[in-house]
A protein has these predicted regions:
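Acidic, low-complexity intrinsically disordered segments
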Residues: 35-87
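Hydrophobic beta-strand positions in extracellular immunoglobulin-like domains
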Residues: 26-28, 43
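A short, amphipathic edge element
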Residues: 1-10
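Short, solvent-exposed beta-strand/turn "edge" segments of beta-rich domains on protein surfaces
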Residues: 10-19, 30-32
Length: 87
């Protein structure tokens, strides 16, 4: 299982400056077959400076959620660090 990309990412308007909400389509390689899932995710910056990433799956997934969520959080953190998220 590997996250290939998150396509069609759109940032939603939120009046809270330390919270960013996004929607998109996660493309994940499950058993050597790319599969698309619609997701909503948020990145919240805590007062300590730590990032908290939350993910909501809009489509149902026929795969254990814990490893998928862990991989997606790592991928989102990586693209956020590289400045790859839309403004």
């Amino acid at each position: 299982m590997k996250v290939i990309t998150i396509k069609d990412m759109i940032r939603k308007d939120v009046p809270i400056y330390y919270r960013m909400l996004y929607t998109g389509v996660a493309v994940i390689d499950l058993n050597n077959k790319p599969t698309d899932f619609r997701i909503d995710f948020s990145i919240e910056i805590k007062p300590t400076g730590q990032k908290e990433i939350g993910i909501v799956f809009i489509d149902s997934i026929d795969y254990p959620l814990v490893p998928v969520t862990k991989e997606l959080k790592a991928y989102i953190d990586e693209i956020d660090s590289q400045g790859g998220l839309p403004d």
